[in-house]
């Protein structure tokens, strides 16, 4: 048995407070209003949605920021099967560049929130918080249609992702909606316990950090969500207490690293390997985290 009571662990499985939800919803509403009321967007088709911990319903911090994607869909990027081009799908060149679109968003947000409350970061446009709203990272992106993944020849059959460019001109492609949908599916398969387990592990990480038991910035909330995503459902479903569920989850992760099966793990989207392509985290980071959490729990 760990040093934490079952009631404490159960409490840590819950999402952020209701009052925080109100500030988050205010922020989202204001961002949508900023874009909708700007005439520059009248002839553009776009979608505003939340991604990250709040979008995935795994947020735990009472003063957390949110990630808001402002995705242009009337002009988009595509990835085609080998030998295919725009013309095979009946597409023509887009009417706006990424930088032009990003600048329109920056102007709209600045007009809404004020110059002093909006700054441009490397990958997002940041909006400051106040008593009414939370801090927001707004990501201007273009729809990314991946036809290659399923070797699709139909213009309407693709994996939906996003593409954007950081300020250092690095291109970024990811699949936040696939991530959200896959997380919902696993949560349903585990009687809602997948996201509860993610939240309790996040809170334990935060507590370890606050108490100087473990500090590693590479153990991100995104990584924790992905690690638990790769834990088989029976490890999440089959135990009667959160204490035992956490213990068995740590055993599985550690065993998978020891036998190298972790190399086949993917992000929640299933579109990228979790430990390939020079990721900021390594298996050594995760091993250290698991060992520290094991000792922190006093197993």
From Swiss-Prot:
Residues the UniProt record annotates as site (Important for uracil base recognition in acceptor pocket): 174
Enzyme Commission number(s) of this protein: 2.7.7.-
Cofactor annotation remark: Binds 2 Mg(2+) ions per subunit; only 1 is seen in the crystal structures.
Motif residue range(s): Pyrimidine specificity motif (R/Q)xW in donor pocket: 279-281
InterPro entries in the cross-refs: NT_2-5OAS_ClassI-CCAase, NT_sf
GO MF entry, a single one: metal ion binding
Residue positions binding UTP: 51, 53, 67, 123, 174, 222, 279
SUBUNIT field: Monomer.
Comment block on domains: The (R/Q)xW motif controls pyrimidine nucleotide specificity in the donor pocket, while conserved Asn-174 is important for recognition of uracil in the acceptor pocket.
Family stated for the protein in its record: Belongs to the CD-NTase family. E02 subfamily.
Protein name: Cyclic dipyrimidine nucleotide synthase CdnE
Lineage: Bacteria, Bacillati, Bacillota, Bacilli, Lactobacillales
């Amino acid at each position: 048995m760990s040093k934490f009571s079952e009631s404490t662990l159960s409490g840590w499985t819950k999402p952020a407070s209701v009052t925080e939800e109100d500030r988050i919803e205010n922020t989202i509403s204001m961002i949508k209003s900023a874009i909708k009321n700007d005439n520059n967007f009248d002839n553009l088709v776009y979608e505003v949605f939340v991604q990250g911990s709040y979008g995935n319903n795994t947020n735990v911090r009472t003063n957390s920021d949110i990630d808001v994607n402002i995705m242009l869909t009337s002009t988009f990027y595509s990835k085609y099967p080998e030998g295919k081009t725009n013309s095979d799908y009946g597409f023509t060149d887009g009417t706006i560049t990424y930088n032009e679109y990003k600048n329109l968003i920056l102007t709209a947000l600045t007009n809404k929130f004020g110059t002093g409350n909006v700054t441009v970061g490397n990958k997002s446009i940041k909006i400051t918080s106040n008593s009414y709203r939370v801090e927001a990272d707004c990501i201007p992106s273009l729809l990314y249609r991946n036809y290659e993944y399923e070797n699709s020849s139909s213009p309407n059959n693709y994996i939906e992702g996003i593409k954007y460019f950081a300020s250092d001109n690095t291109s970024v492609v990811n699949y936040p909606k696939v991530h959200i949908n896959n997380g919902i599916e696993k949560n349903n398969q585990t009687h809602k316990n997948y996201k509860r387990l993610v939240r309790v592990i996040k809170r334990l990480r935060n507590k370890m950090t606050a108490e100087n038991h473990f500090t590693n910035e590479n153990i991100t909330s995104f990584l924790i969500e992905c690690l638990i995503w790769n834990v088989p459902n029976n490890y999440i479903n089959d135990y009667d207490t959160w204490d035992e569920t956490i213990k068995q989850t740590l055993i599985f992760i550690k065993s998978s690293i020891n036998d190298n099966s972790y190399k086949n793990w993917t992000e929640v989207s299933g579109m990228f390997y979790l430990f390939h392509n020079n990721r900021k985290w390594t298996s050594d980071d995760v091993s250290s985290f698991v060992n520290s959490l094991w000792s922190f729990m006093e197993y």
